[in-house]
């Protein structure tokens, strides 16, 4: 086996320090929705599911997954959405109420520091920071190309009232900022009810089995 030598400068380039974090506060279609307008989105490895072409990405090399983070003050929510690939939350600090289901009423779990939560594909999920200060959820998304986001129907409708639209090729159109709605690419429409009805339901007990709390870990 051939040894792989990694120069110090390359190791330094691949080390993302806290001082290297660059937030995007308009990464998603709900960036003007009251209660969701103070989110910070970070893209450490890959662009994740950011819908903003100006999103800063620390490392663009393909890793087979995407790594990012959501930074949120107390009371701020990330609205209901689903992903095409698996997502893992790592609670980096804070208290988050995670909810799931198209209306967020299928179940809830309150996550604290150190939790690792693996979220199924094709399930609407959202979360709110209920801690006393800013919280950080690290997010790991499977595959190099994640496929984007499907937002809950109510999220898209409310965003439209603030001049925000999403194209079928995952571009955020901000008419307030002067963007023109394209004529050659259709806009994303809310998910049809017939497809929503086919989504798998998860009970609180089933979701708890997908949570690894600090006390659940066994070191060897």
Name each model feature, range by range.
Residues 55-61, 78-83, 100, 108-110, ...:
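Short histidine-centered beta-strand/loop micro-motifs
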Residues 88-90, 118, 133-151:
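A short hydrophobic beta-strand segment most commonly corresponding to one strand
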Residues 74, 84-97, 101-102:
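Glycine- and acidic-residue-biased ligand/ion/polar-headgroup-sensing regions
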Residues 69-70, 80-82, 86-91, 109, ...:
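His/acidic/aromatic-lined binding-pocket segments of jelly-roll/cupin-type domains
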Residues 46-56, 66-83:
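Conserved short histidine dyad/triad with adjacent acidic residue
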Residues 62-63, 86, 102-120:
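Short acidic-glycine-tyrosine-enriched beta hairpin
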Residues 73-75, 110-131, 138-142:
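Conserved metal-binding segment of the jelly-roll/cupin
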Residues 1-63, 170-220:
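A short, N-terminal "cap"/entry segment at the start of jelly-roll beta-barrel domains
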């Amino acid at each position: 086996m051939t040894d792989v030598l990694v120069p110090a400068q390359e190791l330094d380039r691949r080390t993302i320090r806290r001082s290297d974090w660059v937030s995007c506060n308009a990464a998603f279609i709900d960036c003007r929705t009251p209660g969701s307008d103070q989110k910070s989105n970070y893209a450490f490895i890959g662009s994740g599911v950011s819908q903003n072409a100006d999103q800063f990405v620390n490392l663009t090399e393909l890793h087979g997954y995407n790594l990012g983070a959501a930074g949120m003050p107390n009371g701020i929510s990330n609205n209901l959405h689903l992903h095409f690939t698996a997502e893992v939350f790592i609670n980096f600090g804070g208290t988050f109420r995670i909810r799931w289901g198209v209306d967020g009423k299928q179940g809830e779990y309150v996550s604290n520091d150190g939790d690792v939560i693996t979220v199924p594909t094709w399930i609407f999920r959202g979360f709110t920071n209920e801690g006393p200060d800013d919280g950080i959820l690290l997010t790991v998304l499977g595959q190099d190309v994640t496929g984007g986001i499907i937002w809950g129907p109510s999220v898209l409708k409310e965003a439209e009232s603030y001049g925000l639209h999403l194209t079928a090729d995952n571009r955020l159109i901000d008419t307030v900022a002067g963007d023109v709605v394209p004529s050659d690419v259709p806009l994303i429409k809310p998910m049809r009810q017939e497809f929503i009805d086919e989504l798998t339901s998860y009970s609180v007990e089933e979701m708890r089995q997908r949570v690894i709390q600090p006390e659940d870990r066994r070191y060897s």
